[in-house]
Amino acid sequence: MKVYISADMEGVTGVTNWEEVDHNKSAYSQFQKQMSLEVAAACEGAIAAGAKEVLVKDAHYSGRNILPLYLPRRTKLIRSWSGHPYSMVQELNSRFDALMMIGYHSRAGSGGNPLAHTMSSAKIERITLNE
């Protein structure tokens, strides 16, 4: 089994303020570690469920938030941005058996998450699931 994990930061446990996800602010390092631990737990769960390959995309801001030292050895981490049209799920394709989204937030205006926002449509016009 091959698993793709895309990780954002605004939905990580305990995040309630933009300063907690801004690498220039003092609270950031605490939530950077929390994000890394949550992604590591997802990787370990995927491996325990039979994944032979786990690919992680750091999909928050600069793409350089996840601390690799927390990830299982067989995990491949994509850092930074390549300009790929799939953006937060770059390199996702039909060879993957599962997609996990860790630390994601709700859409703008939906409530329930103080950092809810929506992806820009500057590069993506439409995303369709289960069509």
Could you tell me what each predicted segment is?
Residues 1-2, 49-52, 73, 94-98:
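Short coil/turn connectors at secondary-structure junctions
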Residues 3-20, 31, 35, 49:
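N-terminal glycine-rich anion-binding loops that anchor highly charged ligand groups
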Residues 6-7, 57-58, 99-104:
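Short beta-strand segments
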Residues 21-32, 73-79, 120-130:
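Glycine-rich tight-turn/loop motif centered on a GG-T
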Residues 26, 30-57:
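Alpha/propeptide regions of enzymes that mature by internal proteolysis
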Residues 61, 65-74:
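Glycine-rich loop at the start of a catalytic domain that most often binds anionic cofactors/ligands
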Residues 73-92:
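A glycine-rich helix N-cap at a beta->alpha junction
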Residues 88-131:
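Internal, conserved structured core segments that host functional sites
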